[in-house]
Amino acid sequence: MSDSVNLDEPSTNSTHFLQCLVTEPRKELQGSRDTHVSYLIITKTNLSIFTRAECKVRRRFSDFVKLQEILSRMNEDCVVPPLPAKHKLEYIKGGRFSDNFINRRAKLLNRYITRCALHPVLHQSPHFIAFLENPNWNNYVRFFIQPKLNNTSKLDEISDSLLNAFSKLKEEPTEFDIQRDHVQQFMFGISNLEGSIQKLLRLEKALESDYEDVSIQFDRLASLDQALDVPIESIQNALQQTGTEYANLTEKLTLLLDTIKDVESYAHSLKELLKRRDQKQQDVEALQEYSAKLSLERDKISSGGSNGFSLSKTLDDLRGIDHNDTRLKRLEHVQSELQAVEQAIQEASAVHDAFNQRVREESKLFDSVRQSEMLSAISDYANVHVEFFTNIRDLWIRVKQ
């Protein structure tokens, strides 16, 4: 996917763009306890919401984590792109400070920033803009953002989720049910593809090792008898270079695997958004159910209630309490509460309807980004194999000549 994002509708004549690039990873404070890697972020844009047309800042991974937290907490109706796993050490030798790991993480962070830049809501967030251009990001977070995050407690969000975790929707709209199934099937397919590629990686690594072993044996054979009338040295070199080609192929296939894992995480974010949509609907349904109970109670009080024996009524008689006055006060209280609940239903329904519309837009954006990224990854995969087999063919043609 291109790092340059056109932010205009097709029908507009002007061209607004936002170009973000994460590049040049650099190890900082090496040898100390605070050793870390910083990444250069270059932003070019003509959007008026930015203070500069071009800016460069350096951010470490923990800064990206904080940005992710801010965007997620303050944009609950959006699919906020996921960050790569903090310790993504599969297929890595040398740990998180190895060049291989650092370069792979830089590519994943670049995809993360590009996804945010593509998003019609997130790219306008003042916090995202500050991340891209504010040289004092840590102070910005400490004094302007952290107090807001503290006021919107994560515990409250978890509590709301737990309250709705054991309740089911009375009737889920068909369109969102279809979306959920679509995402689930996509994640299932991606998971199967990931497993197949991991299997292929193991086979290619084994071939790399086997070609290296055969190359060594040919080298030993050549040293035993220099008079052999066969191009043993050429064969040995071709075998060795074939192993090297497999090593290069494995490295590039690992990058494809990173992309697939990243797209799978992105799909999971959409799945979580659909869950939050369900919570909004459950809020409305719970209020409607409570309103129905209050209406029944109001009607019961209005009709005079039960004419049978009532212990509370008998006690009120002994105390000389006016039953009609008590009934009117109860009726007034229930009507007041019912009015408040009806107002809450209207507000919750408005939030629910707006959330539904946002989910529709997020789903379309996700499909667009997913298709673009997968098409790019598959195209790269094909080109890598064309290059691989071309190089292998050329190697052995030279041996034959």
UniProtKB/Swiss-Prot annotation:
Coiled coil as a keyword?
A: yes
- Which compartments is it annotated to reside in? Cytoplasm, Cytosol; Preautophagosomal structure membrane; Endosome membrane
Binding locations of a 1,2-diacyl-sn-glycero-3-phospho-(1D-myo-inositol-3-phosphate): R60, S62, K86, R105
Q: Coiled-coil stretches, from where to where? A: 190-292
Segments forming domain PX: 17-139
Gene Ontology cellular component annotations, sorted alphabetically: autophagosome; cytosol; early endosome; endosome membrane; Golgi apparatus; phagophore assembly site; phagophore assembly site membrane
Please list the GO terms describing molecular function.
Answer: phosphatidylinositol-3-phosphate binding
Judging by the UniProt lineage, the source's domain of life is Eukaryota
This protein's UniProt keywords? Autophagy, Coiled coil, Cytoplasm, Endosome, Lipid-binding, Membrane, Phosphoprotein, Protein transport, Transport
Q: Which Pfam families does its entry note?
A: PX
Spell out which residues are annotated as carrying Phosphoserine.
S62
Q: List the disulfide bonds.
A: none
Bilayer topology reads: Peripheral membrane protein
GO BP: endocytic recycling; mitophagy; piecemeal microautophagy of the nucleus; protein transport; reticulophagy
What this chain does, per the entry, is described as: Sorting nexin, involved in the separation or division of vacuoles throughout the entire life cycle of the cells. Involved in retrieval of late-Golgi SNAREs from post-Golgi endosomes to the trans-Golgi network, for cytoplasm to vacuole transport (Cvt), and autophagy of large cargos including mitophagy, pexophagy and glycophagy.
Q: Can you quote the domain comment?
A: The PX domain binds phosphatidylinositol 3-phosphate which is necessary for peripheral membrane localization to the perivacuolar punctate structures.
Q: Which PANTHER family match?
A: SORTING NEXIN-4
- Which family, according to the similarity comment? Belongs to the sorting nexin family.
Give the protein name, as stated in the record. Answer: Sorting nexin-4
Question: Which species does this protein come from?
Answer: Schizosaccharomyces pombe (strain 972 / ATCC 24843) (Fission yeast)
Quote the gene name from the UniProt entry: snx4
